[in-house]
Design a protein with these regions (language model features):
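N-terminal targeting leader peptides, primarily classical Sec-type signal peptides for secretion
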Residues: 1-3, 73-76, 173-174
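Short amphipathic alpha-helical heptad-repeat segments
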Residues: 9-22, 92-107, 123
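Charged, low-complexity interaction regions
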Residues: 25-38, 56, 112-122, 142-146
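Short, charged, amphipathic alpha-helical segments
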Residues: 37-43, 121-131, 149-150
Length: 174
């Protein structure tokens, strides 16, 4: 995912969503893989935090903005995200895929709204919308966000260690 300008960043953002969907589909097709809604959240937050790093968005700023917006609003849903998914009617992965579709619909609605108003349709707002939807999903499914983000950090740390080991192995072969 190469990111240079704002347009490219938006393209990369939507590519990231497609990659999340592809990763989940791939894991579902693998007979040896068991996938739950929690793993889907780990995949999504992993991709989202990596994207933020690539486009130099401070992820903690997104978290802080979300916390502030939660304090100031009185239960309203200004983004138009439908968090009414009935988790009892779906398995966890189907419910998560439905939520991803909801994110895409929310982003499309926001883009239309931006064309009519002075709001900016950029990668920061897209990240914030996705983050908000994922956090609302965590709340709805009673997933502990702090533990989830710790798991994402551990995953990223392990991937970095693996990447470093591969580089060292490649150097020693030459």
């Amino acid at each position: 995912m190469q990111v240079n300008g704002e347009g490219n960043n938006l393209d990369a953002f939507f590519e990231m969503i497609d990659l999340i969907e592809d990763d989940i589909s791939e894991m579902l097709e693998n007979e040896n893989s068991e996938l739950s809604g929690y793993e889907c959240l780990v995949i999504s937050f992993n991709c989202l935090t990596l994207f933020c790093r690539q486009v130099e968005i401070d992820f903690s700023q997104i978290e802080d903005h979300f916390s502030e917006s939660e304090k100031t609003k009185s239960g309203e849903n200004s983004l138009g995200f439908d968090s009414s998914i009935d988790l009892k009617e779906h398995n966890e992965v189907e419910a998560f895929n439905g939520m991803l579709e909801g994110i895409e619909n929310t982003l499309a609605s926001f883009e239309k709204r931006c064309k009519k108003t002075d709001e900016l349709f950029d990668e920061w707002n897209c990240v914030f919308i996705m983050y908000t939807c994922l956090r609302k999903y965590c709340d709805k499914t009673k997933v502990n966000y702090g533990e989830l983000i710790d798991d994402v950090s551990k995953l990223q740390s392990n991937l970095e260690k693996e990447k470093q080991t591969e580089k060292e192995d490649t150097k020693s072969l030459n």
